[in-house]
């Protein structure tokens, strides 16, 4: 239990090798289980995490934010998360280190702000860009609500429009921290895999994953036209967080600057209608999507591809025929 201060992680492992974390219950006001790498000459490596339950006012399982040396050979099994403000799974490579050979299977995330967030960024301006590749995430079930997931806990996660450590934190952020509130002018945020121009996220498998969103996205709250995806900021050096880009032009999954992505048996659904595509890809290459199920789509396109190459779909299930459901623009080819 680590709940005395808003910045308290549950369990931090820093620049360590050959570690096992099993059968723990963690309640934290910041990240639940968090691996960090503060030393460019060291690394978190050969770490096994199994059969843990996490409640977090930040992210449930996270690699980062500090990733100077990096992370390699990290295995996660049978993770349950609930009432988690940010992401169930957050893998962040932003400080020049490696993030490679990550294997995550068996995640149940209930009442969590986001399911999956992968980010290759460049916070260490002037230094090398780190790697983010060879990631396997499978057997995941996640429920994403419309309202702040950790509302009512003694110390809630800080609202995105305030700067922790500088701005005064309200006693009850959830009193105003609702999607669509003027302080947060964006709709419910999708899972995302986002790299940088010329530095893509590489070789990621998302398999046997089911994410059910609250939905409710409306143009009156925020709208990024599909013909103007450049309005989504790169935020190259910003602190990595699933909400770092603000409004995104998808309700289920957003992929940008990525290569070698494989979706296998992924189901995306919402409870309330959302006007955005379920999946939007921008600068994605050499990727395949098999048995992608989107049963609740209401508007076209269901999947939108911009500046993509060598993208294939097998067994796409939606209420619309494939020829209508998938829209490709610019140099997109099948």
Stretches with model-predicted labels:
Residues 1-334:
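Extracellular/periplasmic carbohydrate-active domains that bind, remodel
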């Amino acid at each position: 239990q680590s709940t005395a201060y808003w910045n308290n992680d549950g369990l931090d492992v820093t620049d360590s090798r050959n570690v096992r974390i099993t059968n723990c219950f963690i309640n934290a006001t910041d990240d639940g289980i968090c691996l960090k790498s503060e030393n460019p000459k060291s690394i978190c490596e050969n770490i096994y995490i199994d059969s843990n339950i996490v409640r977090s006012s930040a992210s449930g399982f996270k690699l980062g934010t500090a990733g100077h040396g990096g992370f390699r050979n990290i295995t996660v099994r049978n993770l349950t998360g609930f009432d988690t403000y940010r992401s169930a799974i957050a893998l962040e490579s932003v400080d020049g280190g490696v993030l490679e050979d990550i294997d995550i299977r068996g995640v149940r995330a209930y009442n969590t702000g986001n399911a999956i967030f992968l980010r290759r960024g460049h916070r260490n301006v002037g230094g090398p860009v780190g790697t983010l590749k060879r990631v396997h995430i499978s057997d995941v079930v996640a429920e994403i609500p419309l309202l702040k997931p950790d509302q009512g806990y003694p110390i809630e996660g800080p609202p995105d429009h305030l700067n922790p450590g500088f701005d005064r934190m309200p006693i009850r952020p959830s009193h105003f921290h609702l999607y669509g509130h003027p302080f947060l002018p964006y709709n419910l945020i999708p899972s995302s895999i986002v790299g940088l121009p010329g530095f893509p996220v590489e070789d990621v498998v998302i398999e046997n994953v089911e994410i059910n969103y609250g939905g409710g996205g409306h143009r009156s709250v925020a709208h990024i036209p599909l013909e103007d995806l450049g309005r989504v900021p790169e935020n190259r050096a910003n602190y990595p967080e699933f909400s770092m880009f603000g409004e995104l032009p998808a309700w289920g999954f957003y992929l940008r600057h990525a290569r070698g992505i494989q979706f296998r048996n992924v189901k995306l659904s919402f409870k309330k209608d959302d006007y955005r595509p379920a999946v939007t890809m921008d600068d994605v290459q050499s990727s395949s999507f098999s048995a992608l199920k989107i049963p609740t789509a209401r508007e076209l396109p269901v999947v939108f591809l911009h500046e993509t190459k060598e993208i294939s779909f097998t067994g796409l299930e939606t209420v619309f025929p494939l020829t209508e459901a998938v829209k490709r623009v610019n140099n997109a080819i099948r």
